[in-house]
């Protein structure tokens, strides 16, 4: 009886994880940035909490800034463009203030993912 209960619980857990993963994928694919916003480039880290590259970018003829206090990497977009995907780099940590990623004088390992758009 305990074995059947464990199997049933495992099946429910797998089903829940599968549904959750499907919802996440659909949300990412269906997200509409609108006509006046563009996605910021990001870098992954070993804690699986991606951070933005810089705090400001040109988008559809205008400027786009991240909110003050947002975590970021002090890395220029042109450097991000040249980074080798899946290769670890030592990246300076920063915090957005008035559209600038201000250096916190700390570093962490980061990497560009596969399939990142340029």
UniProtKB/Swiss-Prot annotation:
Q: Which cysteine pairs make disulfide bonds?
A: 38-59, 55-96, 72-101, 91-110
Cellular localization per UniProt: Secreted
Claim: Nucleotide-binding is one of the keywords in the record = no
Supply the source organism for this entry: Amblyomma cajennense
Q: What transmembrane ranges does the database entry give?
A: none
Q: Which GO terms describe its molecular function?
A: C-C chemokine binding
- What are the leading ranks of the lineage? Eukaryota, Metazoa, Ecdysozoa, Arthropoda, Chelicerata
Where is carbohydrate linked to this protein?
Answer: 45
Which interval of the chain is the signal sequence? 1-21
> What's the stated role of this polypeptide?
Salivary chemokine-binding protein which binds to host chemokines CCL1, CCL3, CCL4, CCL8, CCL17, CCL18 and CCL22.
What keywords sit in the KW lines?
Disulfide bond, Glycoprotein, Secreted, Signal
Name of the protein in its database record: Evasin P974
Query: Per the record's keyword annotation, is Glycoprotein included, yes or no?
Result: yes
One Pfam match, by short name?
A: EVA_Class_A
Q: Which InterPro entries match?
A: EVA_Class_A
Looking at the UniProt record for this protein, which Gene Ontology cellular component terms does it annotate, in alphabetical order? extracellular region
């Amino acid at each position: 009886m305990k074995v059947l209960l464990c199997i049933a619980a495992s099946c429910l857990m797998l089903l829940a994880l599968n549904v959750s993963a499907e919802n996440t994928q659909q949300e990412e694919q269906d997200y509409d940035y609108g006509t006046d916003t563009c996605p910021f480039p990001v870098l992954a880290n070993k804690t699986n909490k991606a951070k933005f590259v810089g705090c400001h970018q040109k988008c559809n003829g205008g400027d786009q800034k991240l909110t003050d206090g947002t975590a970021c990497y002090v890395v220029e977009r042109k450097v991000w463009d040249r980074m080798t995907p899946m290769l670890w780099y030592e990246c300076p940590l920063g915090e957005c203030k008035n559209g600038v990623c201000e250096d916190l004088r700390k570093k962490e390992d980061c990497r560009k993912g596969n399939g990142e758009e340029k």
